[in-house]
């Protein structure tokens, strides 16, 4: 394992030059201190977890110190926000410190969020607050533990630096890790500013770094776009299967790697609600839970438009057509597993839709339903879960269909079934009220709850003794927390 000063940098994106990013130094925050660190994320850089508790750790990730080989850059990009094109966005408060490669030969971008003003800050102060930094940290590591592709979070560093949002808060910095920070909006920026040479340079860079196998195809750009479509279809299937609502699916928040990117007013479903809107600025419900599926396709078509200089419209259209069938296949596969089914039948989609409608009508807790379904034999589980439903007749009818469906798979060892179902149905999810409790404590200077919650969420499928309160239904106040974009 390495110490912090032993990291090996290789700043490939910075070498593309000033058309793609601007050199900016981070602005330090006052009295930096460690709020929380992720040993699992540190392991991606081969870092010794003990390094998190050294004074230099807080200094490096708060803008006070910088590695000699680091080359901090603010990236330029644009994007469609709530369906409307915004010509210039860019890193308004985050800096790509550089790329580090580990012993396994993997490259990881180090991106410092809340690092101060950049040429792309617009009217912003370039800062991130403790509240939003903790939320992003917990979400990144929780999604990873659920096997949902995501950027990772190495640490949050708190400070005494005041910042103004709806009220005075304290600034913090978060160190985000990802194999790439290239967004759909990077390609859109060079397309709409009519700079085909730079767009080609960006495309060639992305191909060489992240899709080298596509270079062997007759049309490398088309092969790359196809893979971006495939990855995003699979990602959104996982969001829907686990009840994750992103909240701000603008094209500048979409990763070319198909990983969850940029955490704002996100939420996991408590009660199942297909029309749930987690972002209280989203008046029209553009990014509601059920809309994430068509919006994924809309965003891919916005990327396709930006790739028309390199790929024929016909080929792009055909490739976009793969998205929905791929999404459906992944989603149904995940939901069969959540229901404890090991084979596929034609009517499974109907069985699932029927269940979700019943859950919607009765306000049933989405995560706990699936967890409890695996606790006992199908007959006993259905009998136990019945009390959660208002439409008893409807649920009884569904229960009969479900029990018969399971029976058609043959005799199953109940203990094996329980293990198999519990391995895909989490006991612990990042509910907004749990995050809020941890934030309230952290804002008073107590970081123990953030650290405890992070540890619990890092192992969501295993029952953890003494942690029962993290697996409970939310209190009424916890169900309707409105989360804004302010961060």
Where do the model's predicted regions map?
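Regulatory N- and C-terminal appendages and interdomain linkers associated
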Residues: 1-78, 278, 283-487
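Catalytic-loop Lys-Pro-X-Asn motif of eukaryotic-like protein kinases
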Residues: 251-252, 256
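ATP-dependent phospho-/nucleotidyl transfer catalytic cores
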Residues: 133, 162-246, 257-357
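Conserved ATP-binding subdomain of kinase catalytic cores across diverse folds
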Residues: 31-34, 39-57, 62-218, 257-259, ...
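Phosphate-binding glycine-rich loops and adjacent basic patches that engage nucleotide phosphates
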Residues: 1-7, 17-22, 98-106, 120, ...
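N-proximal short alpha-helices
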Residues: 7-15, 112, 116, 126, ...
């Amino acid at each position: 394992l390495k110490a912090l000063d032993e990291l090996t940098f290789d700043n490939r994106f910075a070498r593309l030059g000033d058309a793609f990013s601007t050199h900016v130094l981070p602005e330090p925050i006052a009295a930096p201190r460690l709020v929380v660190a992720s040993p699992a994320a540190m392991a991606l850089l081969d870092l010794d977890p003990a390094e998190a508790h050294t004074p230099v750790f807080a200094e490096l990730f708060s803008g006070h110190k910088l590695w000699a080989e680091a080359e901090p850059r603010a990236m330029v990009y644009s994007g469609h926000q709530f369906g409307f094109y915004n010509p210039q966005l860019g890193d308004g408060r985050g800096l790509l410190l550089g790329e580090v490669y580990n012993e396994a030969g993997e490259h990881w971008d180090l991106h410092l969020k809340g690092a101060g003003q950049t040429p792309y800050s617009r009217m912003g102060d370039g800062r991130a607050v403790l509240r939003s930094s903790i939320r992003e940290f917990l979400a990144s590591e929780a999604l990873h533990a659920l096997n949902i592709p995501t950027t990772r979070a190495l640490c949050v560093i708190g400070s005494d630096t005041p910042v103004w949002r709806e009220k005075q808060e304290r600034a913090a910095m978060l160190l985000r890790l990802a194999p790439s920070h290239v967004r759909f909006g990077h390609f859109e920026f060079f397309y709409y500013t009519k700079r085909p040479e730079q767009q080609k340079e960006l495309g060639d860079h992305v191909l060489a770094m992240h899709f080298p196998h596509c270079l062997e195809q007759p049309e490398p750009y088309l092969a790359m776009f196809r893979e971006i479509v495939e990855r995003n279809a699979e990602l959104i299937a996982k969001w829907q299967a686990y009840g994750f609502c992103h909240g701000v699916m603008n094209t500048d928040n979409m990763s070319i790697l198909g990983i969850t990117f940029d955490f704002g007013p996100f939420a996991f479903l408590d009660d199942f609600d297909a029309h749930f809107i987690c972002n209280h600025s989203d008046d029209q419900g553009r990014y509601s839970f059920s809309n994430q599926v068509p919006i994924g396709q809309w965003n891919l078509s916005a990327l396709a438009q930006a790739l028309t200089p390199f790929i024929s419209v016909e080929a792009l259209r055909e490739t976009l057509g793969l998205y929905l069938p791929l999404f459906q296949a992944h989603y149904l596969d995940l939901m069969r597993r959540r229901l404890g089914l090991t084979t596929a039948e034609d009517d499974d989609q109907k069985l699932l839709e029927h269940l979700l409608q019943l859950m919607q009508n009765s306000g049933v807790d989405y995560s706990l339903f699936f967890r409890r379904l695996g606790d006992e034999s199908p007959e006993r589980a259905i009998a136990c879960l019945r009390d959660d439903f208002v439409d008893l007749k409807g649920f009884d009818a569904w229960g009969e269909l479900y029990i018969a469906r399971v029976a058609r798979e043959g005799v199953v060892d109940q203990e094996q079934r329980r293990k198999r179902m519990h391995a895909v149905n989490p006991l612990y999810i990042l509910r907004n009220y749990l995050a809020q409790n941890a934030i309230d404590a952290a804002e008073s200077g107590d970081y123990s709850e953030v650290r405890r919650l992070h540890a619990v969420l890092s192992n969501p499928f295993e029952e953890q003794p003494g942690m029962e309160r993290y697996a409970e239904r939310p209190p009424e106040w916890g169900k309707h927390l409105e989360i804004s974009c302010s961060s």
